[in-house]
Swiss-Prot record:
The PsaA/B heterodimer binds the P700 chlorophyll special pair and subsequent electron acceptors. PSI consists of a core antenna complex that captures photons, and an electron transfer chain that converts photonic excitation into a charge separation. The G.violaceus PSI reaction center is composed of one copy each of PsaA,B,C,D,E,F,L,M and Z, and forms trimeric complexes. Belongs to the PsaA/PsaB family. Keywords: 4Fe-4S, Cell inner membrane, Cell membrane, Chlorophyll, Chromophore, Electron transport, Iron, Iron-sulfur, Magnesium, Membrane, Metal-binding, Oxidoreductase, Photosynthesis, Photosystem I, Transmembrane, Transmembrane helix, Transport. Pfam families: PsaA_PsaB. PsaA and PsaB bind P700, the primary electron donor of photosystem I (PSI), as well as the electron acceptors A0, A1 and FX. PSI is a plastocyanin/cytochrome c6-ferredoxin oxidoreductase, converting photonic excitation into a charge separation, which transfers an electron from the donor P700 chlorophyll pair to the spectroscopically characterized acceptors A0, A1, FX, FA and FB in turn. Oxidized P700 is reduced on the lumenal side of the thylakoid membrane by plastocyanin or cytochrome c6. The lineage of its organism: Bacteria, Bacillati, Cyanobacteriota, Cyanophyceae, Gloeobacterales. Its EC number is 1.97.1.12. This is Photosystem I P700 chlorophyll a apoprotein A1. PSI electron transfer chain: 5 chlorophyll a, 1 chlorophyll a', 2 phylloquinones and 3 4Fe-4S clusters. PSI core antenna: 90 chlorophyll a, 22 carotenoids, 3 phospholipids and 1 galactolipid. P700 is a chlorophyll a/chlorophyll a' dimer, A0 is one or more chlorophyll a, A1 is one or both phylloquinones and FX is a shared 4Fe-4S iron-sulfur center. The chain crosses the membrane at residues 72-95, 162-185, 201-225, 298-316, 353-376, 392-418, 440-462, 550-568, 608-629, 697-719, 757-777. Chlorophyll a' binds at residue 708. It is found in: Cell inner membrane. The keyword Lipid metabolism does not apply. It comes from Gloeobacter violaceus (strain ATCC 29082 / PCC 7421).
Amino acid sequence: MSTTPQEREKPVRVLVDNDPVPTSTEKWGKPGWFERNLARGPKTTTWIWDLHALAHDFETHTSDKEEISRKIFSAHFGHLAVVCVWLSGMFWHGAYFSNFTAWMENPLGLKPSAQTVWPVFGQEILNDPSTVAKGFEQGGIVITSGLFHLWRAVGFTTTGQLAAMSIAMLIIAALFLFAGWFHYHKRAPKLEWFQNVESMLNHHLAGLFGLGSLFWTGHLIHVALPVKAQLDAGIAPAQVNPFAGLDYGLMGQYFPKGFGPNGGLGAFFTLNWGQFTDFLTFKGGLEPATGALYLTDIAHHHLAIATLFIIAGHMYRTNWGIGHSIKEMLEAHKGPLTGEGHRGLYEVLTTSWHAQLAINLAMAGSITIIVAHHMYAMNPYPYMGTDYATQISLFTHHMWIGGFLIVGAGAHAAIFMVRDYDPVTNQNNLLDRVLRHRDAIISHLNWVTLFLGFHSFGLYVHNDTMQALGRPRDMFADFAIPLQPVFAQWIQNIHAAAPGGATAPWVGGTSPTWYTGALSSAATLQANQVLALANDKISISPIHLGTADFMVHHIFALCIHVTVLILLKGVLFARSSRLIPDKANLGFRFPCDGPGRGGTCQSSAWDHVFLGLFWMYNTISVVIFHFSWKMQSDVWGTVDRSTGAVNHIIGNTDVLLGGQTVALSQYAASSININGWLRDFLWAQSSAVINSYGGPLSAYGLMFLGAHFIWAFSLMFLFSGRGYWQELIESIVWAHNKLKVAPAIQPRALSITQGRAVGVAHYLLGGIATTWAFFLARFLALP
């Protein structure tokens, strides 16, 4: 028997602490326990505002990086639990209050619904008349989340399955809650564990993305695809066998190559992968029957993603001494004009979670906006392309989420600069060089923004003026002086020409949106050019881009550049400026730089985020209005298969020019001036919500009014000075004192920062809910 000499044993690293924080509901039950001043209890009404501001700002609770990291990690599990409870509610409503069963049998003829209004005081008028007319015992209010389409795509066919999933989600939520408690109170990771980025990358890439995609591929092949095959074969949803994917013989009926005598695992291990091409395809484009991406293409896509990410998850150096070191790569990343390059950024990203979060938010926000565009151009779920209310809802939702995430990136980048930036470790690296060039960067960005603003808006003003003067020939328009978006058309042509070429000889086109060909206008579309489903509704069609698109895209550019200008200025000037050299000492948010320092108000990093939110709102509003009008005018509608005609939701506009009539889509003809946007889009399309009272859409009319009120209420906070409110409060307190009914907690007016926070929150809530009501009343009124 031999023993290993002691000196040769590798010491085991303990990466967790046992029982670091006792579980104490008594302590947590005391409001403000996490901060010394708050724990004393309220003296003034400011206390409740500070409670909200600081509850999740862990860095104000402690300066211990390890403790902060553990709190964030634990909170992630709590967040996942909340998401699972929320999803459980979705499944529960789908199981017990929806018309999912009926919708599955007639997805093109019914609108999804998962809630019905009881007949109290006539409120049942809110139930969708088509649902009531068809004699459904369940379902009433139309839902536009796309969940029914998603559920059908992934293999749900009965409400019993939805109920089981609802219970499963609650169980998963409970497990996440337990994990959050366990990893903070019983086995809490050490700071070293959080800073081990190579191991984290390997596990996230190979585990979460790689194996996650592989598991999903398995689900698609063994559950979703056989369910779809049975539905396509005419089997009633209630009779579909959800376990067919586990029966080799049954699968062989639907996929004879992959599950035939020469298929299965044998084909996999002998590298005869061509056998799998009946369920792992590369068809490209959309399935004509459903208007959705081919499910076999989606399975193939996820298998490819899984392969790539599992490989990527083995790239970084951990215990084995092979692979990349992030620190070495960053420090080697320098060029002839970049000084020290990325040296020091490893320390930044492993000691500042704000810096890491800022990068992740910027990427996640951008990806979410890309998702918004993919959802309509390459609709992933069956029959969703013709559910226009759902399509506009999903586009708007993803655009808003993306906008908020990107503003959040600016916020956390600024917090990093104030709280975590170390000038000593960032000497002549790219971060330091950007900060030293900040005046040039911001002034150039400012100039570009002004140029964009005057020129893009100037095109619209020019057109309004020419129209008012009766000179249509002098307008910038497809019918007069065209401004063709040549770069966008070039990108369209690249995508249209790619399939069948040398680069992709086997691939079909990704979407009909690219195939504009000789299309001179959306008004000339024919039925054979669009993808229309069995109910003759258009799912997607070629999208013609012209002068109107060129103009509005320059408005997008203006709005995006202003948003970036505000956020980037907030980040680059977060620590100091000529006006306030000691800004870093004042913190992330401060109202002004004290008395006698006029002109220093609204210059904190927080105030830049505050202003950035308004411009983000402007940006997203223009984008979703453009999308709504363009799709109704140029894409969505119906086809007449007997004549080959395409009838868009909004009919074409005849433009009279020099005695000749030119037919254009309404969007191409009207959106080229401000008057057109106000009259033909906002005013014309708001008729549905304004006239909704007394019908099933009346809830949206009330929401439209209420949201306008919330928006107007915000102006009271945004336009007023704090002094006015404090004086008003003092006089009310005086009256209470006279009557000896003064409260124990002294009333205080909101601080300047609190007032702005309340203002922007109500401004955005009011604006978003107004847009929501405007869109849904319009789209649900359509047949």
